[in-house]
């Protein structure tokens, strides 16, 4: 592991003021030393429980906290020095300017621009408008079919209406004669068939 090698080399290179480093090397490198750990049981019948040393506390903390989850200040400093880029290294001259690419003209766009001049007057046909036109045509077609199917029945109903109008017209003429003092129509009088012309 690269981090372990760097740590071991750093520990060898740094001279210590005392005879021993402030923390055990085995704790930094992640190895365990088979030494006397913290124990609550007394060593002898007349002796009290021995207090744990500083190295034992570090080894106990090393066992309780996994190595992958804990990052020491030395490891964070080495990571910042070796792996992360420095802020003052990059200068304005080394940064390459972004390249600008000239896109070729689109043939579809040119054709659309030329065609827009002739199609500008034409209304835009949308899907909704197309559906409305188709529905209108279908309704007209169904209406024409219904008219053709019921043309004889409609003719019969129309003739009945005209006949009733003619009878009403003759009654109105008779009432006018009676108001004028005539008991009947004059000789040679024929009531016009204004509603039944072809009959």
Curated annotation (Swiss-Prot):
BP-aspect Gene Ontology terms: mitochondrial translation; negative regulation of mitotic nuclear division; positive regulation of proteolysis
GO cellular component: intracellular membrane-bounded organelle; mitochondrial inner membrane; mitochondrial matrix; mitochondrial small ribosomal subunit; mitochondrion; nucleoplasm; nucleus
Superkingdom classification of source: Eukaryota
Keywords: Mitochondrion, Nucleus, Ribonucleoprotein, Ribosomal protein
Tissue specificity of this protein: Ubiquitously expressed and especially highly expressed in heart, skeletal muscle and testis.
Subcellular location per the Swiss-Prot or TrEMBL entry: Mitochondrion matrix; Nucleus
InterPro entries linked to this entry: Ribosomal_mS38_C
Entry similarity comment: Belongs to the mitochondrion-specific ribosomal protein mS38 family.
Quaternary structure, from the entry: Component of the mitochondrial small ribosomal subunit (mt-SSU). Mature mammalian 55S mitochondrial ribosomes consist of a small (28S) and a large (39S) subunit. The 28S small subunit contains a 12S ribosomal RNA (12S mt-rRNA) and 30 different proteins. The 39S large subunit contains a 16S rRNA (16S mt-rRNA), a copy of mitochondrial valine transfer RNA (mt-tRNA(Val)), which plays an integral structural role, and 52 different proteins. Interacts with Aurora-A.
Biological role stated in the UniProt entry: May act as a negative regulator of Aurora-A kinase, by down-regulation through proteasome-dependent degradation.
Official protein name in the record: Small ribosomal subunit protein mS38
Organism for this UniProt entry: Homo sapiens (Human)
